[in-house]
Amino acid sequence: MALAFGLSACAIHPASDPSAFAARTSQNSFELFGAAVDPPETLLLPLVHDPQEDGAACGAHALASLINYWHGAGTVRGADIFAASPPADTVIGYSMAELLALADASGLLASAVRIPAAGVIGELEAGRPVLVPVKVPSVYVQSRQLPGMNVPVLGLPAEIVTSRTAWLSEKTNWSMLNHFVLVAGYEGDKFVVLEPVAGFRTISAQRFERYRAPFGDAAIVFSRK
């Protein structure tokens, strides 16, 4: 994750909660086209983004959003989890086993499973966000973006560059990063994920499947003890 946090350009403006995301669903996505969802028609759980501050801390921040979902807003910060219980490997970040232990210590029932997209949808419909490991192009999870990314008209060329860079990363397996995201909702053939760097983002089911494939559809499902 360190590579992604070393890039520089204009600051990103994350969609930190469902209402902020609803105002501009097409502007925060892994997709170049067809990114928008219609929030009144979208199943979207009321999670709140806990912004990632360290390159190895995505698991801690994703877990913080989950804990705050189950136990109440402001219960914990990912930065505090990371400071108190850093991953054994501070370059790669948290393992699923470490996150399971942290979830248990935080009063959540957590189980590691292999679950296809249909199963993820079932969890969402039961009101349970799902934590999944993904392998993504680093350009998609950097904390800074290309100039003009958030400006109408100027944003499209920057997004095209980002999309092309991501495509090359996938094809060459260069600058691909292991990352954790929370699946927070879905609509049709798109999922909404809460990504620790940029907040709520849409992603096509096809892309989501590709990014999950290196981990064999692994996931962690949660409920309150």
Model-identified regions with their sequence ranges:
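Noncatalytic regulatory segments and standalone regulatory/sensor domains
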Residues: 11-18, 24-34, 125, 140, ...
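Bacterial N-terminal signal peptides
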Residues: 1-8
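Secondary-structure boundary/capping residues
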Residues: 75-76, 129, 192
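...with weaker cross-activation on analogous glycine-rich loops/strands in unrelated enzymes
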Residues: 102-142
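Structured segments of extracytoplasmic/periplasmic soluble domains
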Residues: 65-73, 84, 88, 102-109, ...
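Active-site-adjacent structural segments surrounding the nucleophilic cysteine of cysteine proteases
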Residues: 10-96, 117, 136, 144, ...
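Generic structural motif
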Residues: 8, 110-111, 219
